[in-house]
Amino acid sequence: MGLTPDFLSFCLEFSWTFLLVVIFFFIIFKVTKSHSVNKSKKYKLPPGPKPWPIVGNLPEMLANRPATIWIHKLMKEMNTEIACIRLANTIVIPVTCPTIACEFLKKHDASFASRPKIMSTDIASDGFLTTVLVPYGEQWKKMKRVLVNNLLSPQKHQWLLGKRNEEADNLMFYIYNKCCKDVNDGPGLVNIRIAAQHYGGNVFRKLIFNTRYFGKVMEDGGPGFEEVEHINATFTILKYVYAFSISDFIPFLRRLDLDGHRSKIMKAMGIMKKYHDPIIHDRIKQWNDGLKTVEEDLLDVLIKLKDASNKPLLTLKEIKAQITELAIEMVDNPSNAFEWALAEMLNQPELLKRATEELDNVVGKERLVQESDIPKLQFVKACAREALRLHPMEYFNVPHLCMNDTMVGDYLFPKGTQVLLSRVALGRNPKFWTDPLKFNPERHLKEGIDVVLTEPDLRFISFTTGRRSCPGVTLGTTMTIMLFARMLHGFSWSAPPNVSSIDLTQSSDDLFMAKPLCVVAKPRLAAELYSTNEFK
């Protein structure tokens, strides 16, 4: 008699359970001594589920994947806006209230300015050489200065304007071709997720490497195989970089890779290196051989940075690692925000009408939107801000690690505590937002006040705040608003035939739409505005 799929599944589940039991008993013998060291200290901590000895709430976490959803469900059941979850020897503090979040990131920012050192961030940062994922210390300070002063300064932002414009123009060209040519999906049907993610990937490649394509140039302006593989690897890293891997809390299990996170991140990082490294090596050789003498992109800037002794400021490993982290940072929020916003606006056509009317009034229909128009596009910016509030990319912000015993309110948090600010719960907190689940850009419009995508009071999280705030606010805001503005100004959007309304169902294990948004686009400007210099 053959082995049935059900029997094999049972064996796999039994093996996993048995292995966990063995691991837990092993931990009891190995860590009881170290665990007892902390018993002399009594900390008053927020409420939370009763932990098991030694392993804490790890069994519940492993039984309720994904952990992000389990934590939110747990806090809702407990009716609390701050909780304490013990995962082995790690204390995790999720927060869903903006007022409490500000206590951590504004009042006590200096104490919570570090990051945990875990398997996924070790791999993604190539040994903690970058900025966002790196613990507080000299390496972080060094790389933060590089970003702020050399890559993302106002001067560099203006220097790179032409490259950003090229990719905004190419986006128009690509969507126009989808409108006007018979394609596999039918004339005019556009996969918004692919288009928006491709735009983010294009901007990254153009700013860093001065190219749109790693492989063959696609005549329709769309992504080729290499670009699709690259962007997919980027989102894989984003998915697993802080995914509550069991080895984050029991480090000696890293090599066993019980949940598969390590292999997935390693594979994705291999893809990133496959495309990045040859370009970086060749560019360094060009500079060393005197074949290149003028800086043309941010890779050139990184290579030519000098220290006080006029020696290269960055090592080859630091350059590679920081470029990969920039790729991760540049592609996520703009694409996800626009996909959700367009879906919401198609179900509320009056919002779509108001946005296009604003664009027509500010820009007209004889030219394309430019970055210089952004200050006047208050409603478009409000739509983007509302999308970031209601539909964040991740459940939690990057963890903040407590660097010393710290009193916050009535609680004393021990050194090593990890604080997680819930992006989804902060933005949907009914105490701070009226009708929080409704997409309502109007809530962000106030007479005489410019709409911005930042939120220093942490009523939602876009670029966060404090020492670990994102240094790329200007670039991130520009990319997001230009994506919204170009797509809404350049095309009329409608649901596919026989679809009465857009399905706004959220994915079961992340915050993407359950199905990629595929809608019909029609050009609303003169045909010559959609062509680019490259393809004329």
UniProtKB/Swiss-Prot annotation:
Topology feature Lumenal, residues: 30-536
Chemical reaction(s) catalysed: L-isoleucine + 2 reduced [NADPH--hemoprotein reductase] + 2 O2 = (1E,2S)-2-methylbutanal oxime + 2 oxidized [NADPH--hemoprotein reductase] + CO2 + 3 H2O + 2 H(+); L-isoleucine + reduced [NADPH--hemoprotein reductase] + O2 = N-hydroxy-L-isoleucine + oxidized [NADPH--hemoprotein reductase] + H2O + 2 H(+); N-hydroxy-L-isoleucine + reduced [NADPH--hemoprotein reductase] + O2 = N,N-dihydroxy-L-isoleucine + oxidized [NADPH--hemoprotein reductase] + H2O + H(+); L-valine + 2 reduced [NADPH--hemoprotein reductase] + 2 O2 = (E)-2-methylpropanal oxime + 2 oxidized [NADPH--hemoprotein reductase] + CO2 + 3 H2O + 2 H(+)
Main location: membrane
Cross-referenced Pfam families: p450
Biological process according to GO: cyanogenic glycoside biosynthetic process
Gene Ontology MF, one: monooxygenase activity
Bilayer topology term: Single-pass type II membrane protein
Glycan-bearing residues: N38, N232, N404, N498
Binding site for heme: C470
Tissues expressed in: Exclusively detected in roots.
Transmembrane portions of the chain: 9-29
Family: Belongs to the cytochrome P450 family.
Function field: Involved in the biosynthesis of the cyanogenic glucosides linamarin and lotaustralin and of the nitirle glucosides rhodiocyanoside A and D. Can use L-isoleucine > L-valine as substrate, but not L-leucine, L-phenylalanine or L-tyrosine.
Protein name as catalogued: Isoleucine N-monooxygenase 2
Gene: CYP79D4
